[in-house]
Amino acid sequence: MLAANERPEAPTAIRIDLGAIFVSLELSRSKWLITSLSPGGGEKMSKHAVAADDIAGLLARFAELKRKARARTGRYFPTIVIQEAGLDGFWIHRVLQAEGIESHVVDPAPIPTSRRRRRAKTDKIDGETLVRALLAYKRGEPRVCAMLRVPTPEEEDRRRISRERKALTNERVRHVNRIKGLLFSQGVSGYQPLRRDRRTRLEELRTGDGRPLPTHLKAQVGRELDRLELLIGQIKAVEVERDAMLAAAPVGSAHFADCEQPAPAMLLALKGIGPEFAAVLWSEGLSRHFDNRRQVAAYAGLAPTPWQSGSVDHDQGVSKAGNPRLRTTLIQGAWLWLRHQPHSALSLWFKQRGKQNDGRLKKKKTIVALACKLLVALWKYVNAGVVIEGAVMKTP
């Protein structure tokens, strides 16, 4: 045992010299929890709550934090705010920026948390965790969190068209399946609700035992057709709006010099790429700025996820941590690319991988790899004008 005079000294507190007031916002439908760490206040974080959507109360609390920090230190400090991306969108971030406050929106998934099976989870703990993540980010520590690049209101609104069309088509599928299910219970099959003569054919239908359709069932199917026709009209209206958006895209949307065409027009010029594919690619992905192809693949969730520990070294597949709409569209577009661009370098690579597997083509994994390669190739095509090797353009 060590003597009293030989015992190590007790650890001293780490001195923190803050150059700003660091604030995190925990947003909910009823209240906003403000967690702050101010200069001159030690290591203890203060917490205050304001009613949800009370911007005036939020700004008043920020002003009070500045006043107290100035009273303690005699200096003026800026405010730096962090919040998680969620249901509230980006309007609070834009309000804070308009007030001259530095604001950050963070992806909550990569923030380090306890790996215990049952861990404590409260707004207080989450607020303190966000403040610590913000401190580490401002110190320049790598991979401590993932800050989002907040889209402009125009970029955010541009995505609405393709997303609304997807929601409408999903709803259309539900109505079609419901109509077919109602009729199948009466022994009727082969009825196509999407055909133009759907009303006429409904009047001619007979049950499996030769009876006319029951009165109430026929009325229910008629009301389902009313909803289906409303959806069909709305989908057509959205598609017209989508085509107008693609046609009105500025020439500068292609990011390289001497480009006389906007990015959507360049995409539509390739055989196998239609208006919907081009709209999703442009609005969800290619309209953004990326520094390299790794960022492109990571944004779509198509980046590899390695697992290395000791002698274990294998790949877990793609991360799926990116934009799910873009990733789904790319998988579908990869199959269309094989059909319409069979002699391109990408399609030949896909076929060569099949031969290497002795004909037992692992299509699911290979088509995902092709989708990643296709996205990178289209990004280079739109941003640098690099034409995809062997790609065929549409005939005018």
Curated annotation (Swiss-Prot):
InterPro entries noted in UniProt: Transp_IS110-like_N, Transpos_IS110, Transposase_20
Lineage: Bacteria, Pseudomonadati, Pseudomonadota, Alphaproteobacteria, Hyphomicrobiales
Transmembrane intervals: none
The family this protein is said to belong to: Belongs to the transposase 20 family.
Name this protein carries in UniProt: Putative transposase y4rJ
Protein's UniProt keywords contain DNA-binding: yes
Pfam (any one): Transposase_20
Keywords: DNA recombination, DNA-binding, Plasmid, Transposable element, Transposition
GO BP, sorted A to Z: DNA transposition
Highest taxon in the source lineage: Bacteria
